[in-house]
């Protein structure tokens, strides 16, 4: 698996699409190319850009331009009626005396599932995504339930699914991994975007795809990993075997912001060292004491909040 490290604004997705173009120029069938991302937004953007750029039908020609987890879910032999739904969670809730959230849709984002589930279900599924014991995760994080309650729900949840031959979202990912030799498609080349955000369980899917692909390229930036809370294993991306390259020119970050950003990333203890050049523009960095001091009525704004405060 060849890694492409892309600092902010260096064009990771564009670089991957240029490589898609090279494959198409060589005569590779579009359906023998997989372009996979962590979020639906990134996957859909790549699909739309590829359809327009290469004059392809997004549904017929680019069916493998999608999220990594949606590919895995679509390739299992689990039928729709076997998937845990709202009615199943309601029935289980009545049996155990604890109200649980209903099941997310199959095209939901993994990070949305982690933030919307009941805290106990969240803990159970996050432990599975991280491939660690539920007790270990419970000991490492805060949850407003005692261990006996968490363990009780965990055991009841497993028994309910087993008894009724039902699967949840994470079960379907595991099913793909367990049967990857049979259910994973074969590709000429696989492109993986946002690789820094994959959990250990998703990395198992990525490695299964690597085995079924003649070539595989994984693009990402460990400095931009924002989904550790959802199980992202950034260190796995950094430690992958194989060659790599770093995109060295940003087309987004001006000089003044680049200087501040470099000071901040220098505080990160475990990272892949990267050098890149800012775009030829000074830009500006301003320190604002209160958000009310900013006129948000014009232009586009990206506001980052820390610890839920804004």
Where are these regions (language model features)?
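A short helix-to-beta-strand connector/capping loop
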Residues: 56-63, 242-243, 280-286
């Amino acid at each position: 698996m060849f890694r492409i490290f892309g600092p902010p604004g260096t064009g990771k997705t564009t670089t991957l699409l240029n490589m898609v173009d090279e494959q198409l120029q060589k005569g590779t069938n579009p359906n023998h190319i997989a372009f996979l991302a962590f979020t639906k937004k990134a996957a859909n953007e790549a699909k739309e850009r590829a359809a327009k750029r290469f004059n392809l039908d997004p549904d017929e020609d680019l069916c493998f331009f999608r999220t990594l987890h949606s590919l895995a879910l679509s390739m299992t032999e689990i039928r729709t009626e076997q998937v845990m739904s709202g009615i199943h969670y309601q029935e289980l809730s009545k049996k155990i005396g604890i109200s649980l959230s209903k099941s997310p849709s199959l095209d939901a984002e993994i990070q949305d599932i982690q933030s919307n589930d009941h805290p106990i279900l969240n803990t159970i599924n996050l432990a599975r995504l991280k491939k660690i014991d539920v007790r270990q995760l419970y000991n490492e994080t805060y949850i407003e339930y005692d261990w006996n309650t968490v363990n009780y729900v965990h055991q009841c949840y497993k028994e309910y699914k087993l008894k009724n031959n039902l699967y949840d979202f994470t079960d379907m990912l595991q099913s793909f991994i367990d049967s990857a030799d049979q259910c994973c498609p074969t590709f000429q080349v696989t492109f993986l975007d946002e690789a820094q955000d994959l959990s250990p369980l998703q990395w198992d899917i990525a490695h299964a795809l690597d085995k079924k692909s003649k070539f595989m390229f994984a693009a990402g930036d460990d400095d931009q990993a924002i989904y550790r809370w959802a199980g992202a294993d950034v260190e796995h991306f950094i430690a992958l075997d194989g060659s790599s390259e770093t995109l060295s020119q940003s087309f987004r970050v001006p000089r003044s912001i680049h200087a501040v950003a470099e000071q901040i990333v220098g505080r990160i203890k475990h990272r892949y060292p990267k050098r890149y050049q800012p775009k030829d523009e000074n830009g500006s960095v301003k320190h604002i004491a209160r958000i009310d001091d900013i006129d948000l009525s014009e232009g586009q704004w990206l506001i980052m909040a820390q610890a839920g405060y804004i």
